[in-house]
């Protein structure tokens, strides 16, 4: 079977998807809740919530790790159009080492980074070590992020990561956890704290969403 996306048409496909996302952006009302008051951080999210990055206020000083694949080429194109810096890496050992070094260098010059901690292929909701090691090595805090909506236009697709995204007019909330600092914590302790915080954000999101509705968070569209 011929793959619909290939090296010959990847530029056109990327451009087309970006234009579709721009159209969706006009119908999406994304609001930030509990945005972190930190100068620098490592944003982390589940792979299913990768579009949370669109709500970040500091896109131009944030690097995103994206896989070296054709699908990654599309994501990379869109991310750069949105104003992010992009670092590419693979799930193999050499690719992971190269990607970690690139992100480490960005942190050392005061930039932020964003990592999907159970990507690129899972296991589902299992935090991998990349963000954890970078936080311990640099001292930069980790900020977990979740996104949530109760609108019917907020869809979940049948994929390994249960990806969520808006399709039509949609009110969405980005909810941020408190910064997690690595001092005096082992890899295992920090990993557990990050995972538990991400799961807790998912748990409290419905309550936060209802509270935001009462406070009129989406009145000024």
Residues covered by each model-derived region:
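Membrane-anchoring hydrophobic helices of lipid-metabolizing enzymes
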Residues: 1-52, 58, 101, 169, ...
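Catalytic core of membrane glycerolipid acyltransferases/transacylases, capturing the structured
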Residues: 39-94, 138, 153-154
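Amphipathic coiled-coil/heptad-repeat helices and related helical stalk/stem segments
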Residues: 46, 96-100, 127-128
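Cofactor-binding loop segments of dinucleotide-utilizing enzymes, especially the Rossmann-like FAD-
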Residues: 67-69, 118, 147-150
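Short, charged beta->alpha transition segments
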Residues: 72-76, 98-105
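Catalytic-site beta-strand/loop segments enriched in glycine and acidic/polar residues
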Residues: 104-138
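A cross-family acyltransferase "interaction/gating" segment
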Residues: 129-185
């Amino acid at each position: 079977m011929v793959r619909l996306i290939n090296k010959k048409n990847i530029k056109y496909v990327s451009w087309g998807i970006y234009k579709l996302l721009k159209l969706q952006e006009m119908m999406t009302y994304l609001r930030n809740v509990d945005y972190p008051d930190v100068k620098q951080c490592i944003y982390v999210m589940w792979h299913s919530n990768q579009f949370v990055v669109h709500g970040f206020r500091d896109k131009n000083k944030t690097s995103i790790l994206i896989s070296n694949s054709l699908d990654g080429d599309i994501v990379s194109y869109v991310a750069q159009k949105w104003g992010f810096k992009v670092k590419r890496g693979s799930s193999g050992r050499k690719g992971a080492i190269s990607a970690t070094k690139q992100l480490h260098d960005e942190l050392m010059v005061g930039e932020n980074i964003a990592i999907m901690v159970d990507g690129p292929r899972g296991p589902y909701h299992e935090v991998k070590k990349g963000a954890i090691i970078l936080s311990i090595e640099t001292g930069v805090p980790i900020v977990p992020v979740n996104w949530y909506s109760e609108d019917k236009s907020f869809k979940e697709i049948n994929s390994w990561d249960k990806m969520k995204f808006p399709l039509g007019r949609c009110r969405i909330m980005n909810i941020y956890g408190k910064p997690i600092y690595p001092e005096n914590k082992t890899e295992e302790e920090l990993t557990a704290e990050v995972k538990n915080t991400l799961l807790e954000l998912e748990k409290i999101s419905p309550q936060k969403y209802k509270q935001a509705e009462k406070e009129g968070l989406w009145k000024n569209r």
